[in-house]
């Protein structure tokens, strides 16, 4: 059955939900742009800030589809997010893979359901494993800039407050109404990261930890950072978790990797009163900025790409 006829039949069925039909419409467009052997990717990779170079150096053939051409996709206006979808074979086993070079965020004004639409596209295209990367601030005082953290848990603050990508009528074609998330991050995939790092003698320190999702676009205050750290978060960022929630709803296995691009300031702000009394001057330190994030991301992309290419051989 062709993609067009499949979509036509789905539209004739009144029980199908709008998210499912939209995903099929995007799929129909994409499979017209890529050869059949790449039209059913097994793995999908989402590249975070500065990590878009993960898509470079792919073995030919590589097929590029701009986000702006895909039905129901949006374009990111954040530096470091190219807004292009690539299809290529990855790893020694030439695993068909789709790579999202950049993501669009809810802080850009997009509904959270829109920011996670690419994950539902993954599902209807046949993706079994999603590898998602991000740039994050290090809350754990043992983490250094340039370290990697494999997510083993998360804290979804916007989700707890009602900004959940699964809100509204359940898109039953993808999953159940109340999906469990106690083991959202696949243990076997996490083990493969350490195996790959060892095999390729990756010198970067690799941690496992908990990621706190905040909506942004402001970086965290000192008090907010201390609160997150006290709650058990090791890193903090403005993405990933909504994608993970939708992926697990779809039954897609998840591996998520954070690159620590800055150390979050958790110390209390200096007291103006105390400084006046001791006639001292203290400079504020540690203000985060996006340029710093991009620079660290670009420097780390090669190591991340090496590990991901190795991991896909065992999926």
UniProtKB/Swiss-Prot annotation:
CDD domains: PNP-EcPNPII_like. Belongs to the PNP/MTAP phosphorylase family. This is Putative purine nucleoside phosphorylase. Its main location: cytoplasm. GO terms for biological process: purine nucleoside catabolic process. The keyword Glycosyltransferase applies. One of its GO terms (molecular function) is purine-nucleoside phosphorylase activity. Its EC number is 2.4.2.1. GO terms for cellular component: cytoplasm; cytosol; nucleus. It is found in: Cytoplasm; Nucleus. Phosphate binds at residues 49, 81, 103-105, 135, 239. The keyword Isomerase does not apply. Pathway: Purine metabolism; purine nucleoside salvage. Keywords: Cytoplasm, Glycosyltransferase, Nucleus, Transferase. It comes from the Eukaryota. It holds the Pfam family PNP_UDP_1. A purine D-ribonucleoside binds at residues 220, 262. PANTHER family: METHYLTHIOADENOSINE/PURINE NUCLEOSIDE PHOSPHORYLASE, PURINE NUCLEOSIDE PHOSPHORYLASE-RELATED. The purine nucleoside phosphorylases catalyze the phosphorolytic breakdown of the N-glycosidic bond in the beta-(deoxy)ribonucleoside molecules, with the formation of the corresponding free purine bases and pentose-1-phosphate. Cleaves guanosine and inosine. It comes from Schizosaccharomyces pombe (strain 972 / ATCC 24843). The lineage of its organism: Eukaryota, Fungi, Dikarya, Ascomycota, Taphrinomycotina. It catalyses: a purine D-ribonucleoside + phosphate = a purine nucleobase + alpha-D-ribose 1-phosphate.
